[in-house]
Amino acid sequence: IYSTILFTEFMERKLNIIDCPGSDDFCGSLFSAFKVGDVGVMVFNAQNGWEVGSEIQARYSRELSKPLIGVINQLDAEKANFEGTVESIRAASRVKPVIVQYPVNQGPGFNAFIDVLMMKLYRFKDENGTREELDIPAEEMERATELNRELVEMAAENDEALMELYFEKGTLTQDDIRSGLKIGLSRREVMPLFCTSGKRDVGTKRLMEFIINVAPGPLKAPKFLSTEGEEIAADETQPAVAFVFKSQ
């Protein structure tokens, strides 16, 4: 019923995590977590889509100007519905969602998805997150190419230089796409969507890779207000300032 503070080290980086209660009855701690976090990871149940708790999370992130990454979880459930979940997000969210990954075999056998940023198929061999990277099969190439184009256009829209580059070359590199998504995330104009099965450890590492490489850090965070109403920005050259929050 309370938030839990934990961390993990991955790709030579430390990720600080505030795990908030999943029940709507204990959503009060969400506000404190959003207050100190750099980015919110909004987890959707693939069977239910956008729910009441989703609206609460979206409102808090909006009030505190914090970016959101969407994760469609439980894709291994019998009634998992990726497309329906995406449509419910599009209908309810004020931040435009963009698909980064989509499942190829949702349901009880779910163990693979296509990543349209990397343009690869990832298949997971076991429940320890062990994966193999494969070429996209011919029957999925048309859909993957279309979603990649949408991702490229979304990235280009966030930066004039990237837009000019897109018009000139007709596409963007993976680094260019990441750069555009980072800008869009910082402005809260885009919510990238990922596929996972937390129970089977499917997609977790790719999500963490994206957070490390693309999600905006504290230097891009909105300025805090001191008790005197003074704006305080993240600046290592200025005197140290502490912000205390409670997790219980």
Question: What do the predicted segments below correspond to?
Answer:
Residues 1-248:
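Structural and coupling elements of P-loop NTPases
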